[in-house]
Amino acid sequence: MLDFINLINNINNPTSPTKITPKVIPIKYEIKDILVDSDEEKYECDICTLELFIESEPKALQCKEGHLACRRCWERYLSTNKQCMTCKTPISSISELSRNRYLEKEYSNWLNDRLVFCPNSNENVFRLNMSGLPAINNSNQTLHQDLCNHGAMKFSELQNHYKACESRILQCNLCLIKFCSKDSDKHQNECSKVYSKCEFCNSNILRSSLSDHHKTHCTKYLIECPHCKIMIKRDTITKHINDDCEEIMITCSEYLCGKRFTRSKMQIHSLEHSVTKLMNQNEIIKKDNQNLDQEKKIEEIKLKLNNLLNNYIQLKNEIAVLKQNSFKEMVYSNKWIIPEYRSFNALYTHKKSKNSNDFQVGSHTFYIKIYPNGQAGKQGKFGVFLERKPRYGILLKYMFSFSLLPPEDSTATKVSLGPIHRVLILLLIDFEESRSLSCGTNVFTDSRKVLKDFLNEKGELEISFSITIQDEKIIPL
């Protein structure tokens, strides 16, 4: 008889535990569960009425006189009685029973020609085999979508069908979740136990821990300086605060005045001290200037004053450049890929919109909103907008752009918007907490042109976008 369970186990291909190499879950079922016509009574045990032949080992055993029963019934009966249950022939152990090879061969020939359904098309069998461990799809609604719909076939053809059956039950070797073979690619992209490369520090982090890694551990993740609000890499924040932060208060130590200023103002304060001191010296020299030597000293002081002034101007320029360069890292570019866009377009009719997932640019939260078939009054036009969730009490200067790229084999041309520059001043009294800030266009392109020219071979629509934070300042309340 066909060893169906061993066949399934041979399909498994285990590899390194750090990769997703799902194994096939051996399917458990009874022949009557898959037969098209249930007329197998001839091969049922007369005692328990269950199947005589299941799995790989022979279950039908007989005594010396030919009385037949399944192995389960023999084991149960011989545990308390050492004789045949029919003819009472003495039997000391189950090893004295024999197989009925003629009946086994007859059953095998009979079964191979029977019409059967795939075990994965039986809801009860499928539900039973999906139980015991977490499963991706285990609700009644999704269960029916996972059942095999191949139709009837000969039992002898079942093994070849099962090798390619999309409803074959697999189990992830990493997270132990069960799923159907057709969902392999989906699980590959969603498994919480897969390691992903952190986009900031390039460390390999569990996908389920990536968000926590960014919030607490990633040394290259941009965090906000609590004093000057500039975004700084986590591993340089201490040095930034100790040596560079322009808003840290420090005490004047050069001229014993004891005054406290922010670091940005302390440099100017020191220059003012130097200028004042030199000016006082200049006044004294002027009063005592009675010879050419005194005139020479005055010229020297003027030269020093001029040098100090040049240093003062250079320092102010360096501070301005330093502030400007602190925003160079606040540039974000990405793509929003919408799968099965034709179905998506049919669902989001005129006036209906769809939002992308939120994304962070520095300390600011944005998302993309599209109108596949137009806003009110713009039916048939593809609208796209950049939405920003408000963060109050700041002046924000940024620019953004959108573009649709046609597939490589298309003759269509790229459609772009931007770069568009925006300057926002957000006070606490201006907006409600839930309101977002929108900018974009409701006539980006024609909705039908999107369907015709911009879908790739998978039916996906790719929207490329880029956002650059150019400047931000805190506005006192």
Swiss-Prot record:
Localization per Swiss-Prot or TrEMBL: Cytoplasm
GO molecular-function terms, A-Z: zinc ion binding
Keywords recorded for this protein, A-Z: Coiled coil, Cytoplasm, Metal-binding, Repeat, Zinc, Zinc-finger
One GO cellular component term: cytoplasm
Start and end residues, zinc fingers (RING-type): 45-88
InterPro entries attached to this UniProt entry: MATH/TRAF_dom, TRAF-like, Znf_RING/FYVE/PHD, Znf_TRAF
CDD domains in alphabetical order: MATH
ZnF locations on chain (TRAF-type): 160-211, 212-267
Residue ranges of coiled coil: 271-326
Transmembrane segments: none
Source organism superkingdom: Eukaryota
Covalent S-S links between cysteines: none
Start and end residues of each MATH domain: 331-463
PANTHER family: RING FINGER PROTEIN DG17-RELATED (PTHR10131:SF65), TNF RECEPTOR ASSOCIATED FACTOR (PTHR10131)
Family: Belongs to the TNF receptor-associated factor family. A subfamily.
Reported function: Probable adapter protein and signal transducer that links members of the tumor necrosis factor receptor family to different signaling pathways by association with the receptor cytoplasmic domain and kinases.
This protein's domain notes: The MATH/TRAF domain binds to receptor cytoplasmic domains.
Name of the protein described by the UniProt record: TNF receptor-associated factor family protein DDB_G0278133
Organism of derivation: Dictyostelium discoideum
